[in-house]
């Protein structure tokens, strides 16, 4: 389940913004949270221009980058008010009581420039520009260069090549993402 998303210089958010999708101390709708405190679903309500769609697009972006057949224009997510040509997105999930953190950064001139994947603070994927190292199947790390594309998540490449067969938590995470739905 998605616990948190952090957007930096992304669409209408010039500054770093974190949205926590965990329950509060209010008793209203207390059954809307899983045992780990993460919301089972949520609705964003607010004034026009307050960032509701930006948050939803940030969430949807990961699913699109992993599973869409189309190549997305990554430059279209840069904040028009920001001074930097970089933006970043970080996701935190709770799967089987383990924390998965996945982040990527985009330079709108170079496309994807970094990706990081952690499982309970253990690095499993580290990408910088056109080289990447994966610790998913090999604890010593496997180096990749030719498989790294400027406009595709390396996480996607690893998933489609291995299906994360050696890691049931990552497999369940991807299945969760495939089954996710959003309405805008």
What are these regions (language model features)?
Residues 4-8, 78, 139-144:
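Intrinsically disordered, low-complexity boundary segments flanking structured domains
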Residues 14-16, 97-101, 123:
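Short, mixed charged/polar active-site loops
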